[in-house]
């Protein structure tokens, strides 16, 4: 019976993620990665993608692996992208479950854990709509962090002795493959690249002194480091930084803003942090820390990867909310790992009544926010269709400087809208100017800045009315 319920839950999320990913319109950066870098033409082959990302590495950024994936998915179309997103979501849930296990467990027999993972992903992931459904962002954070979880599983399991760390565990012929996979992982993203290098270095020191270190650990770690260096030393990253410094960017002032974003991210993951603290309290109370020393180190490793990926962003010149995604994913895994330790000792974590109440509240939250997001989704689809008709009509009339009407939906946690603004120099405007071969494009008006400390505090959309009214 549990298996059937588990399959039903996974099937629901597979369909939910597929539908949302398929129906959401493309915005800003998606259009950019549909085009060949340095040209105003659409990508027409995989060769174009290689050329485009080669140029991109030298002119704007170093995240080649996720950007190759993003351009490939955009080239292959919505159907393939939606299927890949949904499949990766199920893989993410599986990997979080697997990396948190302290002994062998059958995935489909643990409905409550799968329910916990999917619930926490929905509640705690900042800018959920952007992270999972905006193709370029999804490739930068969702797909890459899932891949990194896969590679970190070997490190995490090595603490508890759940993998054979003997040097002959893997064929020597596979060692170069682990190195290559490590390079790709380190090359994916600045914050996760740093985090896996930092946490895995500490793990390797521990394995060395406890005679657990093997060639797989070293090949992965060296791959992480090489990939991270390829990323941070890319000429494109230096160009990007120079462009920021040419403006009014003040690094000292930015640090205070970054610290604020850091604490907002901690606050939005506070349910997970509270759960960690409570499970550690139970561990101390029942005096099981020594007994499960290595399993607690496994949990610590998971937390260190997530926390390091978030903390390093304080020193980055750009700290978007989406960059907290790895922290959320690894924090969920940390909580489950701690729970598995406590549960192995048959320590009661929570009464069944309290558990049902919490899941009831979570279900209510999901129903309200998800149904509202779907309503907003169909509204923005209709708006984009009307916008496209409006643009094509003006282009057919020979216009090169376009003014478009505003949408009836704003960006929120579960719906991501990266619309053009009134300023034609805004980055989204410039992307569409290239895409449509125009002189300029702008929106007729801008809406007032939200009172929320961040857009993802906006949980419920008041959609249906234009986000702003033209002053003319």
Label for each model-derived stretch:
Residues 19-83, 135, 185-300, 314-323:
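Transmembrane catalytic cores of multi-pass membrane glycosyltransferases
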Residues 89-100, 147-159, 198-205, 275-283, ...:
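Transmembrane alpha-helical segments
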Residues 118-126, 182-186, 223-234, 304-314, ...:
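Aromatic-anchored segments of alpha-helical transmembrane domains
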Residues 110-159, 189, 267-272, 307-338:
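Membrane-interface micro-motifs in multi-pass membrane enzymes
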């Amino acid at each position: 019976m549990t298996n059937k319920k588990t399959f039903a839950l996974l099937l629901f999320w597979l369909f939910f993620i597929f539908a949302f990913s398929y129906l959401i319109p493309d915005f800003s950066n998606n259009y950019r990665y549909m085009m060949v870098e340095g040209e105003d033409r659409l990508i027409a082959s995989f060769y174009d993608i290689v050329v485009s990302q080669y140029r991109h590495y030298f002119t704007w950024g170093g995240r080649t692996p996720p950007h190759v994936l993003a351009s490939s998915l955009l080239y292959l179309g919505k159907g393939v992208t939606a299927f890949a997103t949904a499949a990766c979501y199920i893989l993410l849930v599986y990997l979080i479950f697997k990396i948190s296990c302290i002994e062998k467990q059958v995935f489909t027999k643990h409905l409550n854990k799968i329910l916990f993972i999917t619930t926490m992903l929905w509640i705690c992931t900042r800018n959920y709509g952007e992270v999972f459904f905006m193709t370029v962002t999804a490739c930068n954070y969702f797909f890459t962090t899932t891949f990194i979880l896969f590679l970190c599983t070997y490190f995490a399991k090595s603490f508890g002795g759940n993998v054979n760390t003997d040097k002959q565990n893997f064929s020597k012929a596979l060692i170069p493959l682990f190195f290559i996979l490590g390079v790709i992982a380190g090359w994916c993203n600045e914050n996760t690249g740093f985090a896996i290098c930092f946490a895995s270095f500490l793990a390797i020191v521990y394995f060395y002194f406890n005679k657990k270190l093997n060639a797989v650990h070293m090949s992965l770690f060296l791959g992480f480091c090489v990939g991270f260096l390829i990323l941070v030393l890319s000429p494109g990253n230096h160009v990007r930084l120079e462009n920021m410094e040419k403006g009014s960017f003040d690094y000292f002032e930015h640090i205070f803003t970054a610290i604020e974003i850091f604490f907002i991210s901690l606050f939005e993951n506070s349910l997970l942090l509270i759960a960690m603290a409570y499970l550690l309290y139970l561990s101390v109370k029942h005096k099981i820390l020594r007994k499960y020393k290595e399993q607690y180190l496994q949990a610590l490793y998971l937390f260190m990867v997530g926390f390091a990926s978030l903390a390093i962003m304080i020193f980055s010149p750009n700290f978007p909310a989406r960059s907290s995604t790895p922290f959320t994913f690894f924090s969920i895994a940390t909580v489950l790992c701690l729970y598995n330790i406590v549960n192995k000792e048959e320590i009661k974590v929570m009464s069944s009544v309290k558990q049902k109440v919490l899941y009831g509240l979570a279900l209510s939250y999901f129903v309200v926010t998800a149904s509202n997001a779907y309503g907003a989704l169909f509204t923005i689809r209709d708006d984009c269709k009307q916008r496209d008709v409006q643009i094509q009509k003006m282009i057919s009339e020979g216009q090169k400087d376009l003014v478009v009407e505003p949408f009836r939906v704003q960006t929120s946690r579960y719906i991501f809208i990266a619309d053009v603004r009134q300023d034609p120099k805004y980055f989204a405007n410039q992307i569409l100017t290239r895409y449509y071969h125009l002189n300029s494009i702008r929106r007729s008006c801008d809406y007032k800045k939200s009172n929320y400390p961040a857009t993802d505090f906006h949980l419920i959309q008041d959609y249906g009315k234009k986000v702003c009214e033209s002053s003319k």
